[in-house]
Amino acid sequence: MKLKRLAAIVLALTLSSSMLVGMTACGKKEDDTKTKASEVTVQIGPNPETLDPALNSAVDGGNMLVTLFEPLLIIDKDNNVVGGQAEKWEVSDDGLTWTFTMRDGLKWSDGSELTAKDFEYAFKRLTDLDLASPYAETVIGMVEGYADACGNPDPNTGDPTTEPNKDLLNVKASEDGKTLTIVLAYPCSYFDKLAAFATLSPVNEATITANGDAWAVKPETYVCNGPYMISEWTPNERIVCKKNPNYVGGWDNSKIVTDTLTFLLLEDSSASFAAYNSGTAQLIKDVPTEEIPSLTGKEDFHVDPILGTYYISMNLNNEIFQNPLVRKALTLAIDREYVANTVMQGTYSPAYNYVGPGVVDAEGMFLDNSKAANGGKTYIGEDFAANLEEAKAALAEAGYPNGEGFPTITYSTNEAGYHIPLAEYLQQAYKELGITLNIDKVEWASFTPQRRAGEYEMARNGWVMDYNDASNMIELFYSSNGNNDGKYNNPDFDAA
């Protein structure tokens, strides 16, 4: 794999990649929070782009979906894969056939029966090219018949080259709806983790048929199967969820003590912090960056490591970024230590590789292969002064000495967290190369769709891992991957 050709600039990661920053009301008295255990209000992000499990690709939407839907399997508090809607599962000796046995008494939130046939429908729905599920290839690309079911899309245009037929996907529910059998084209050691991923949740065919895309935006049509169900949705304000009285699954109902769970839909960290301090919210994800030094060490302030990487996407449909020397220059001009420890106040760790520490084989086979492809050293060294000189030399070799003749770049980002301070740092960093960078601030509701559609030049990006395997990050650069925002297209890479 020619990783140096990837259309991304790796910025910072932690255990590896980034840190989850937030506050919980554990240190407050009940009188202060004005809440009871039966009612909890949390802030984990703004209005979600979508709450259709097949279409979501954002962390905040994913955090909501795990309360509203339950896949075949779930991940317990100890990070173990356990039964969800399936009470047990078996894998054939060759690792290809996975058989899931459903729990008894499964129901949808509207009280109707839920069976393995609903999972078959959900899996096959992902092959619909018109649906354009960004995660489809990631979660079922290894299932036998996937490419044929999709119509064998052209890698350049995405158009089918054969007649799509969802029934060619080798996923089949038994006649009684009690078992689901999935046959893989090749063994996938982490398929159990995929079976616990929100994208592979069942969806209700009746409500989708009756309401089309609108099924996932109104409480009255939002039929789900998780511990909670939506009772009220005021866009850009709040989503109120009530306990699902029909829930049967992997979680112990007796331990689900919160009757009402409200998602406060805020992106502005100052507004989130104010909501927390007033007792309106009992848990928030976003706090103002300037407050972090004074909050550090307090009982209700938490900084926890997560697996993921913060990076920059360069749109390879833009001719300027098709030159690998330009990409190299823009990459090496970033002082990762300064970004992680000063701009991001120590909540991130510097990233000198795309796949960070904590990921299986990140510091073993993956790093060894990366060094072997680059003369025995990593592509990005820790000596920033040397990196900057190498960046200037690369830009000159590309035909832009001291940035002469290089076009102005527009960098797109939303405004949450450290995104704007980072963008402002990049402006200064690229000035050292003689390059002008403009910042385009985009509302969150438009940001990810715009980036996915390729309507940008450079854009902030990031990936929080869905499962602990380097493939989860590397596959983002397959030309057919729905999350390939940089539009990287390399037949050799696709074939690897």
List the predicted regions and their residue ranges.
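N-terminal lobe/hinge region of extracytoplasmic solute-binding protein
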Residues: 43-93, 223
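Aromatic- and charge-enriched surface segment that lines or borders ligand/interaction sites
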Residues: 87-139, 181, 320-322
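Extracytoplasmic/peripheral linker and loop segments enriched in polar/acidic and small residues
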Residues: 171, 378-384, 438-447, 472-496
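Periplasmic binding protein-like
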Residues: 42, 111, 411, 428-478, ...
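Append "and occasionally in soluble cytosolic enzymes with long acidic Gly/Pro-rich linkers
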Residues: 242, 322-428, 487
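Surface-exposed binding/hinge segments that line
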Residues: 120, 132-206
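Gly/Pro-rich hinge or "lid" segments in bacterial periplasmic/extracellular proteins
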Residues: 77-80, 157-158, 166, 184-255, ...
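Ligand-site clamp/hinge motif
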Residues: 246-293, 436
